[in-house]
Structure formats: C-alpha cells, structure tokens
Amino acid sequence: MRITYISQARFPTEKAHGHQIAQVCAAMVRLGHTVTVIAPDVRGTVRKDPRAYYGVRESFDVVRLPVFDGLRSWWVPGSLAFFFTMRSYARALRSYLRVNSTDVLYTRSPVLLPSLLHSKISVILELHTLPRRTSVFVRHCRQCQRVVCLTALMRDELIGWGVDSSKIIIEGDGVDLRRFENLPSSSEARTAWRLPADRRIAVYVGSLITRGTIEKGVRELLAALALLKERGVFGWIIGGPRDQIDRYRVLAVQSGLGDEDVRFEGPVSNTRVPSALAAADVCVYPAPALQHSFFLRDTSPLKIFEYLASGRPTVSADLPPLRGVIDSSLVHFCQPGDAQDLARAITEALEHPKVSQEKRAALLAHTSWDARMKRILLLSPSV
C-alpha cells in the first residue's frame, strides 16, 4: 500500500517530533508499505539524510514542496509568518495531491486537514494534543478514516466533543527495541561519555521545555539532586534547547550543585541515546505541579518506554496519561512538583530497584513501533 505522511514542519528536524515521524514511517516500511514523506521546503539547521540523522535503516522518500517561508521573511510580522507559510503550503499540497496518487494520507497536524480531506483520499489523523474545540475541527475528525489519540484521556475528551468513538484508537508512542540490542556495559558507556566511574548516575533525556515555554521538570530534578548530593548521586541532563541550558546552569549553582554534581550534555543524536541510558544507574522522568493539559492529558509515554527498554530502574512523575500504560510494578512513581518525593523515589530506585520483567517484556512487545502501526493500519476502514 502507498502511504504518504504529510508533515507540517521541515523534515528532518532537531525537534522531538521528527524522531517520532521517522519511527512511524520506518515501521510502516517494515510492514511492507511504500512510504513517502511530504514536508515544506523551509530552511532548517539539519542537513543530513533523514535515515542517517534518525538512525533508521528503512528507506522512504522525502519530497519537499516549495513554499513561501514567512518565518524567514523579515518583512512579515511574526504573528502572521506561520499563517502565510501554512497558506502557501496548503496550496502546494493540493497541487501535489492532484497529480500524485496514494492510498492513504497520514498526518499529525490538524491544520493541514482541509487540504488533505479536499483530495478525497483516506486520511489518518494522529493527535498529540487537542486544538481549541471548534465545530470545524470536529467535522474534520468525523471525515477522517481514523483518529489516533495518544492517551485515553484525549480520546474521552474528543468523544465528548462529538467525534464517533468507532473512529478513534488509543495508541501511545512506540519504542524501537532494536536500538537497545547489544548495549554496552555500564563501565564501557561511562568511559565513552567521560562520566565519573565512582558515582551513581541519574539521567534525564528529553526536551527541557515543551510547547515553547512550559518547563518539564528539570527545576524539580535539580532540587532533588541537591538533596541527594551527600549520597553521591550525579545528575546527567541530556537535551535542549540550548538557549535554556544556561538558565538551568544558573539554577543548579543556586541550588548548591557544581560541575562535579551535574552535567548538562545538551542535545544528542537519537542514535546515541541507548548508550547514554546504559551508562546510568536510574532514568528519571520528572514533572512540575502544573495543571496544564500537557501533563493532565497529553503526555506521551515514549521516553518511559525507552527507559524501560534500556533495562534501567525508572522513576516517573505520577501523571494521569502515564497511569494508563504503566504502573508501580514497572516504575517508581513520585509526585509531580515535589523535589523531596522525587529524591525519595530516586533513592528507592537505586537501593531497591523493582520491575516486573514479565510485565516489562509484554509492555515493550505491545508498544513496539511495528505492533503499534500494524494496529493503526489494520483498524482503518479503507486500509
């Protein structure tokens, strides 16, 4: 089957969603489908081939459509730049789809639905958050062949808006288990990353902020590391954006943490993440005590799955969306926004690691990218 993945943003990209898109497309290729990624031809910082950049072996075409890049046009007001870019991209998409046939259109961008639905080709929409509720968006969801929600809470809200439950499938992000085969030993990984051999290492891998300005729990992690300083716990924080790192470095110093207590690695390629996790004693997914939809409804379990795939003890903030897929037999939970409870959970994971190996193996098998995409495509009425 021919599947065309429509990206709203440049591809490849240094942002986390690009990794997710690459994994989705690679899985569909492994399932025997022919995949093409369509993206706007806008200037970005990543120049590498997508397969090399994301560390995937499967081959899929990438087509970049010429568009007006409002974000790079100095004379376009910032508030209008995205609008004009998407308007230009919508026209380019309609022209492309008129002359290039495909069986299914796949996207995670609701803003592109008018152009995709206009083509009369079957559309699968994957939602990573819900836009503002409008009658137009609900109507577009009803016209899609399948709507994929990352969490049950997202699905429930969408049904409440009037979308038929039979169109919706709940599928969190997946994990590529092959990336975690033949991991280096802890000592080998620490040597490669130049990490202290005599410290217990707590690692966080991921974005420091989300949706532009929302903190993801690094502040709480630094406070917990300050509490654990006397226990010899070394904090390793991997991720960007880089413009946030200096701010957190200042906060670390204010918390009494020096370079011998915490390292900010900055962004690393996805291909290096497994070896980074192998170097750690415990993997941490913190969160602030914010009543924001990202934490209450939309949080993806992708990073938790990767932590579990590494075989390391895992500490996670107890967030409602994550409770739908993991429980206390798999991770050590802590209260969001509570540095003392985070320090407690890290200590517990280091001294009394717990994980049900049977449940872990079953969860990871169920949530592999291949299994995930097979369920999505099989449940789509026209596929």
Annotate each PLM feature.
Residues 7-15, 27, 31-84, 96, ...:
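N-terminal strand-loop element at the rim of the active site
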Residues 276-297, 312-313:
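Acidic donor-binding loop of glycosyltransferase active sites
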Residues 153, 174:
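Carbohydrate-associated surface elements
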Residues 239, 246-277:
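Nucleotide-activated donor-binding/catalytic signature segment of Leloir-type glycosyltransferases, i.e.
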Residues 49-54, 181-195, 357-358:
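A short helix/loop element that forms part of the nucleotide-sugar donor recognition site in Leloir-type
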Residues 4, 196-216, 222-225, 236, ...:
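Conserved donor-binding/catalytic core segment of Leloir-type glycosyltransferases
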Residues 185, 337, 351-380:
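A charged, aromatic-enriched C-terminal amphipathic alpha-helix characteristic of glycosyltransferases
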Residues 301, 328-339, 348-353:
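Conserved acidic donor-binding segment of nucleotide-sugar-dependent glycosyltransferases
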